[in-house]
Amino acid sequence: MKKFTNHIYYMDNNPETDQPYVYLIHGSKFNLQIDAGNSPENYHKFLSEVKELGLKEPKLLAITHWHWDHTFGMVACNVPMIASVKTNEYLMKAKNWKWTEEAMHDRLKTG
């Protein structure tokens, strides 16, 4: 976890594992997490790093967009989550997708 300012921290991305940047906004009343990461493990790693800094866990999670590498960690989240209406529409659609190689290949062809 790296400190950007007194109120903004971030966990670095890792292109080898498609781990995105995940952010913590440190507020005076509560902390906000930006994006959930690409897996439950990624989500828990973020929380561990927050604790290592002596900061409180986030009380709210904001999702910037629906891509899997920013949302698959949501299944491990136990705080309220917010997203735009458009992002939520895509998340509701994507939750029914199959993740076989064939299904992913078909989605790549059709967009």
Per-range role (PLM):
Residues M92-G111:
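Metallo-beta-lactamase
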Residues E41-T87:
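Active-site metal-binding motif and surrounding structural segment of the metallo-beta-lactamase
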Residues T17, E89-Y90:
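A short acidic, often aromatic-flanked loop/helix-cap motif at beta-alpha or helix-coil junctions
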Residues K2-E49:
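Conserved beta-strand hairpin/beta-sheet module of binuclear metal-dependent hydrolase folds
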Residues Y21, I25-S28, N42, E49-K51, ...:
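General N-terminal targeting signals
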